[in-house]
């Protein structure tokens, strides 16, 4: 099955995980408590798509979609959103469509677990925080398992 065909399954898996009591856990990859990149990596891994562990590694692994100053109209469900500053990617989420995305965020600037935020105009403080830190987006177009690449 092609990666794009698995995206609805991946998004459903994340939605299911969000319904289980969870908190943000730095380094969390096993659930129910995840950090941002652990959630994304585990969601893809559960559907036999192997991607890197950390947000900056995932950013390098993805096919580039847009930079923060460009329009994000080309986003598709399952695209990966990268947050941080021009020097460093330090947060990641996955686009669920219609301007919304899933991510696991901490309690200081987030929802202390898996939540949904928006790229649309809003008054929500958490969404606004992450909108200000959006730097780019990418698309998972391949899987790797050590040195073996598959599509």
Pin down the residues of each PLM region.
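Catalytic cysteine-centered active-site loop
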Residues: 20-76
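Short glycine/proline-centered loop/turn elements that form peptide/ligand docking sites
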Residues: 74, 87-89
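Loop/turn positions that initiate beta-strands
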Residues: 1, 75-78
């Amino acid at each position: 099955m092609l990666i794009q065909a698995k995206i609805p399954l991946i998004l459903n898996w994340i939605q299911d995980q969000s319904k289980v009591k969870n908190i943000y856990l730095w380094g969390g990859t096993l659930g129910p408590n995840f950090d941002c990149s652990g959630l994304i990596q585990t969601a893809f891994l559960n559907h036999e798509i192997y991607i890197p562990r950390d947000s900056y590694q995932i950013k390098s692994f993805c096919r580039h979609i847009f930079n923060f100053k460009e329009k994000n109209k080309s986003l598709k469900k399952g695209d990966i959103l990268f947050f941080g500053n021009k020097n460093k990617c330090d947060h990641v989420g996955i686009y669920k469509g219609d301007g919304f995305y899933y991510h696991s965020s901490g309690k200081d600037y987030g929802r202390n677990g898996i939540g949904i935020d928006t790229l649309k105009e809003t008054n929500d403080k958490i969404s606004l925080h992450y909108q200000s830190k959006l730097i780019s987006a990418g698309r998972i177009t391949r899987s790797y398992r050590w040195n073996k690449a598959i599509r």
